[in-house]
From Swiss-Prot:
Organism: Annulohypoxylon moriforme (Filamentous fungus)
Start-end of Acidic residues biased regions: 216-235
Protein name per the record: Myb-like transcriptional regulator mfmK
Protein's cellular compartments: Nucleus
Role according to the record: Myb-like transcriptional regulator; part of the gene cluster that mediates the biosynthesis of the phthalide-terpenoid hybrid 11'-O-desmethylfendlerol.
Composition skew (Polar residues), residue ranges: 374-385, 396-408
Record's keyword terms, sorted: DNA-binding, Nucleus, Repeat, Transcription, Transcription regulation
Upper classification of the organism: Eukaryota, Fungi, Dikarya, Ascomycota, Pezizomycotina
Location of the DNA-binding region in this protein: 32-52, 83-106, 134-158
Gene3D superfamilies: Homeodomain-like
Residue ranges of every copy of the HTH myb-type domain listed in the record: 1-54, 56-110, 113-162
InterPro entries listed in its UniProt record: Homeodomain-like_sf, Myb_dom, MYB_TF, SANT/Myb
Length: 462
């Protein structure tokens, strides 16, 4: 068991100095076993080190110079490991200093190469076996290492292991324990007001179409509230108390600072009741009427006369305007002509593109198309629009009552269904007329309205 190191006291130093002086005065050599008997509790080794390292006069302290190293190497070659004679040959160092400096620095058998993992493992195993008895460990360590080198290497390995353990413990605690200020996040419903890009680029203020996006949890309640509000608005708009007419409420010409931006606000009530008495008697309002219900009282005009006259148009003021390059619906007969009695004239407007997708052929003409129930003037009761067997007529031309009417032949029987796609550009006034006419059909219509400037889509379900 290793002894506990104790500091030398002043009394112990006095006793050691007195014993050394007595031996020197009598001319006796310094026998440290005999001198240690004069200092209770101290060994011969303790007394020798204390004398030569601290109390002896003329002993050099600190690093060795090159001349001292050369004298030490020569003395060891001559006297071996007799450190007393080596110390006398050196003259500036005591025997302990000579022994320590030779074994730790100048011994040619010392290994100064890098430590390998196997050598580290052998050192740790030796410490487990011999504790910190570095003299015993150095005697059996391969390759040869000094006691100081073994001690320093063990201190380095222990410090490295402690740092790794602390780092792993810190990481484990950070994973297992959440931060003190940690709060679980919850989904919060927000009302986000969407502003179309047209407002930014055009600089005309708020856009008339505001889309309110809400969370899924509030959609059901909001739908009920919106239905109630729309029912109240429809009661005010009807005025006459007729519950069968579910006409849409359309606001046109929203403006900022008195400038009409051509936007449309549409409020539609989802109802299956037909809005027009002319169509109420039909069992299938969405089915197109057969050919027999359209009029055939117009004269034939060759197709070439329409295709070549790029400046001829038909002025239509109630529904919409068609311009050169439009597609219209007509029958395809062998003569290459269509039935029409429309008078047309030239006018200027913004080009549009209307594509009526159906099984019947298309001809490119410069005119407008109108579909509305015909009046009962000059007709018998059997052909009146309000009867079950007579659907409304299709008219091509202006809104005058004297305009000839043209029918479209080639359609199938009354029970057939058709899917019609229309692509057009219109103004606010034209949009109001279009929405009124479509709402009166009493069928489900999906309409996609885009803002022309920035292509911002808005879908309305009628």
């Amino acid at each position: 068991m290793a002894r506990l190191r104790r500091r030398w006291t002043a009394e112990e130093d006095t006793l050691l100095r007195r014993a050394v002086e007595n031996a020197t005065t009598q001319g006796r050599p310094l026998l440290w076993r005999d001198l240690a008997k004069s200092v209770p509790g101290r060994s011969n080794k303790d007394c020798r080190r204390r004398w030569w390292n601290s109390l002896a006069d003329g002993t050099t302290k600190g690093p060795w110079c090159e001349e001292e190293d050369e004298r030490l190497i020569e003395a060891v070659r001559k006297y071996g490991t007799n450190w007393s004679r080596v110390s006398r040959a050196i003259r500036s160092r005591n025997p302990d200093q000579c022994s320590s400096h030779w074994s730790q620095v100048l011994d040619p058998g010392i290994n100064y190469c890098d430590w390998t993992p196997e050598e580290d493992a052998n050192l740790l195993h030796a410490v487990l076996t011999h504790s910190t008895n570095w003299a015993t460990i150095a005697a059996s360590h391969v390759p040869p290492r000094t006691r100081l080198a073994l001690k320093n290497r063990y201190s380095t390995l222990r410090l490295k292991h402690e740092n790794e353990s602390k780092r792993e413990s810190t990481i484990r605690k950070s994973v297992e324990t959440p931060p003190s200020n940690f709060e679980p996040t919850m989904a919060i419903s927000k009302d986000v007001k969407w502003t179309p890009p047209a407002q930014i680029h055009q600089g005309r203020g708020p856009d008339p179409v505001d889309v309110l996006i809400e969370s899924d949890e509030e959609e059901d309640d909001d739908d009920d509230d919106e239905d109630n509000e729309e029912d109240d608005g429809d009661d005010e708009n009807r005025g006459d108390g007729n519950s069968k007419n579910s006409m849409p409420h359309i606001e046109l010409g929203n403006s900022l600072n008195g400038v009409d931006n051509g936007a449309v606000d549409i409020q539609m009530q989802d109802t299956g009741v037909t809005a027009s008495n002319d169509w109420a008697d039909f069992t299938e309002p969405s089915a197109l009427p057969p050919l027999d219900y359209f009029h055939h009282d117009a004269q034939h005009i060759p197709m070439d006369s329409w295709a070549n006259d790029t400046e001829s148009h038909v002025q239509y003021e109630d529904l919409l305007e068609l311009t050169p390059g439009e597609n219209y619906l007509c029958d395809m007969d062998d003569s290459g002509a269509m039935n029409t009695g429309v008078q047309y004239k030239s006018y200027g407007s913004t080009p549009t593109n209307i594509d009526l997708s159906n099984p019947i052929g298309f001809h490119e003409l410069h005119r407008t198309v109108e579909i509305f129930p015909s009046t009962t003037t000059g007709m018998d009761s059997s052909s009146a629009p309000g009867s079950r067997d007579t659907p409304p007529s299709m008219h091509f031309g202006t809104s005058a009552s004297t305009t000839p009417r043209t029918s479209i032949s080639g359609w199938s029987h009354q029970s057939a269904h058709y899917q019609v796609c229309v692509n057009m550009i219109c103004t606010g006034a034209q949009m109001e007329s279009l929405m009124t006419g479509l709402a009166s059909l009493g069928t489900c219509i999906t309409m996609k309205i885009d803002i022309k400037e920035d292509k911002a889509p808005l879908e309305n379900q009628l």
